[in-house]
Amino acid sequence: MSSSPAARRELSYSWGYLFFDEPPLSVEKAWRLVQSSRFGKTLILVGDVVSKSFRERGLGDFFIVDGHTRRNLKVEDLPGKAEAFTCKNRPGEISRECYELLRNLLTSAIGRGKKIVVYVEGEEDLLSLVALLYCPLNDSWVIYGNFRGYLEVIPCTSFFRSVAENLLVKHFEKD
């Protein structure tokens, strides 16, 4: 699926909780929010810097990374005993391969106590929408770094799931 100009416009708006601090402060604030909420503690992390920042504090259950960062950081130290998967995804798109992989993993594999890492060949940015669509409802959070540099922390609720679904249906052209 390719994103339309309208999708890019709508995705420029922020949703969920926003943290404008740099790591580690942003991570600490986000984790306090998660701990004090009723939405579970499962963390789905999208992006290399976010994944690295949370992982350095022993946090995270599901990681979606592409090996590229705007800050040119090398992301290593993801969970060594994690189940690792790979898919290809071009910039500005959501490939069928990544969509299906994330849907299957998020609906069946997450929550079994094992860490999961999805390595994306290409770009992972838009895959946060798929994560929101299939995250464990009322029991998880999708967290990613916004292109403006702040941390977006979104509880997996029916409201945010419907926002992601509407964006995908209305503003992504099926290939």
Swiss-Prot record:
Keyword RNA-binding among UniProt keywords: no
Keywords (A to Z) from UniProt: Coenzyme A biosynthesis, GTP-binding, Kinase, Nucleotide-binding, Transferase
GO biological process: coenzyme A biosynthetic process
Membrane-crossing segments per the record: none
Alphabetized Pfam families for the sequence: DUF359
EC numbers for this chain: 2.7.1.237
Domain of life according to the entry: Archaea
Involved pathway(s): Cofactor biosynthesis; coenzyme A biosynthesis
One annotated GO molecular function: kinase activity
Top-rank EC class of the record's enzyme: transferase
Catalyses which reaction(s): 3'-dephospho-CoA + GTP = GDP + CoA + H(+)
Residues noted as binding GTP in the record, renumbered to the chain: D48, V49, V50, D66, E124
Function, in words: Catalyzes the GTP-dependent phosphorylation of the 3'-hydroxyl group of dephosphocoenzyme A to form coenzyme A (CoA).
HAMAP family assigned: Dephospho_CoA_kinase_GTP_dep (MF_00590)
Similarity annotation: Belongs to the GTP-dependent DPCK family.
UniProt name for this protein: GTP-dependent dephospho-CoA kinase
Classification of source organism: Archaea, Thermoproteota, Thermoprotei, Thermofilales, Thermofilaceae
